[in-house]
Amino acid sequence: MAVKVLVVDDSSFFRRRVSEILELDSEIEVIGFAVNGRDAVEKAASLRPDMITMDVEMPVLDGISAVKEIMASNPTPILMFSSLTRSGATATLDALDAGAMDFLPKKFEDIARNNEDAIKLLQSKVKEIGRQRIRRVASPRPSSINKPLFTPTSAPSALAARFAQTNKTATTVVQPERSFNNSPVTSRSAIVTKRASGKHYQLVAIGTSTGGPVALQTILTQLPANFPHPILLIQHMPAAFTPAFAARLNSLCKIQVKEAQQGDRLQAGVAYLAPGGQQMMIDGRGASRTLRVFEDNSERISYKPSVDVTFASAAKAYQGDVLAIVLTGMGADGREGARMLKQSGATIWAQDEKSCVVYGMPQAIANAGLASESLPLDEVAIRLKTEVGCG
């Protein structure tokens, strides 16, 4: 079944090019256009698309207001297009708060010049987001969260090889585990009454993608100022957006939230957001641990920042004293890094399917048998505070 799309933009050129690009994919069908936010609200009701692409800045009714009205009257997955400016980043975060599912930078040059990577990204986002609507109206698909699918691997992963190359002090490459049957995913009923494990932690690391901004805000705003450990945040997000996102979180949270910088010393009660377009790793030992933030030109690691890269670095720096959490997101970034953490004795949690915007990254963790618990989003902060002893 093709994903039915409503394209919303006040630029006729952008509407036409987005439509042409989407319809290159046989699994996507553009069923209509809207030229402003008011038009979008009306056509969302009349056409009932599976998903909507929408510009943030439009006449008559802006994108943020349109998102609010659509989500109130005809809830539909929405992908926002936003300019790569500080005001554009702030507006995009407002749109996500209003209910939009995800966003892409609005780059006319990529659209005009048929940038292959940009085209594939747009098509994949539209299909993944649109299918969330299709799954809601179709019969529920069975959850595989309690049925781990183990895929034995005899060779080092690309991540492990990359990590060993980047970290000059590494002397061995960790081999992926073949089975984690001793750490099954915990059911929700068990989670509600579960007490702290008593395990010792030094670091919390959280990785996410689609749906992550709202998920992170939900969790971090519930943490106390005296949270006992540093927190590393890896959110797939362009470089122009991470400063605004860190600033927004910092204004809402009791803990300090900042965009990570080269040489930052890791401190308890501070959350460090990986900068867009760069990787974030950990250098040093003990109290002298600092962050290494750098541009990665490797083609072997698709995401910048990458959850895998940071998780792998945490496994080396902290061994088993890490609580890693994988939240909503497309793809499987984080799985190989979580595998290395698991081998070091770390604890891995995954967000459950029902509360995810996109059940991709957490599903990869669960299916690989790496998650000791699968948690609904609204319970993550409660469990986290209990687990680290500040509940």
Swiss-Prot record:
Gene that this polypeptide is encoded by: cheB
One GO term (biological process): chemotaxis
Domain of life of the source: Bacteria
Protein family per UniProt: Belongs to the CheB family.
Compartment(s): Cytoplasm
Protein name: Protein-glutamate methylesterase/protein-glutamine glutaminase
Lineage: Bacteria, Pseudomonadati, Pseudomonadota, Gammaproteobacteria, Alteromonadales
EC number: 3.1.1.61, 3.5.1.44
Free-text note regarding domains: Contains a C-terminal catalytic domain, and an N-terminal region which modulates catalytic activity.
KW Ribonucleoprotein (keyword) present: no
Modification sites for 4-aspartylphosphate: D55
HAMAP family found in the cross-reference section: CheB_chemtxs
GO terms under cellular component: cytoplasm
Response regulatory domain segment(s): 4-121
